[in-house]
């Protein structure tokens, strides 16, 4: 559970990857990315998560460094989830998510 002022958010560990702690952390903050909604304050959520994680698990910078890659993977997984479930009615989000994944890949220097 993440707590922000008077709001609680639940981490859905069903989406967590076995043994990939960076993916677990990416899932926890993915819905705070700017393209998912307005006013999500990703930087604040990300920094708070990292600070808390490093406090509990010091010397895990190698895990922290994987989070941007896992954020990209999560975005691509959501695209696939939407494509597989047209009855859910989220197709209109696909172009936004594709653009976001391209931007994430560029930030990771995977694309020019």
Protein language model annotation of sequence segments:
Residues 10, 14, 37-38, 64:
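Residue-level detector of alpha-helix boundaries and kinks
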Residues 22-58, 72-89:
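Active-site activation/catalytic loop segments of kinase-like enzymes and analogous catalytic loops
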Residues 59-71:
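All-alpha amphipathic helical-bundle segments outside canonical DNA-binding/catalytic cores
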Residues 20, 41-51, 63, 96-105:
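Generic hydrophobic, helix-prone segments enriched in Leu/Val/Ile
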Residues 1-6, 49-52, 56, 104-111:
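Short charge-dense sequence patches
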Residues 40, 77-112:
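ATP/Mg2+ or Mg2+-diphosphate-binding catalytic cores
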Residues 1-23:
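Active-site acidic catalytic loop and adjacent metal/ATP-binding pocket
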Residues 14-15, 31-34, 49, 100-103:
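Short, surface-exposed linear patches
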């Amino acid at each position: 559970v993440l707590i922000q002022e008077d709001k609680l958010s639940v981490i859905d560990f069903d989406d967590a990857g076995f043994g990939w702690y960076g993916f677990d952390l990416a899932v926890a903050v993915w819905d705070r990315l700017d393209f998912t909604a307005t006013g999500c304050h990703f930087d604040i959520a990300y920094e708070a998560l990292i600070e808390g994680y490093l406090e509990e698990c010091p010397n895990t910078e190698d895990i922290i460094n994987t989070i941007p890659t896992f954020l990209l993977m999560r975005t691509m997984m959501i695209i696939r989830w939407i494509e597989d479930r047209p009855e859910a009615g989220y197709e209109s989000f696909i172009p936004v998510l594709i653009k976001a994944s391209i931007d994430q890949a560029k930030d990771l220097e995977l694309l020019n």
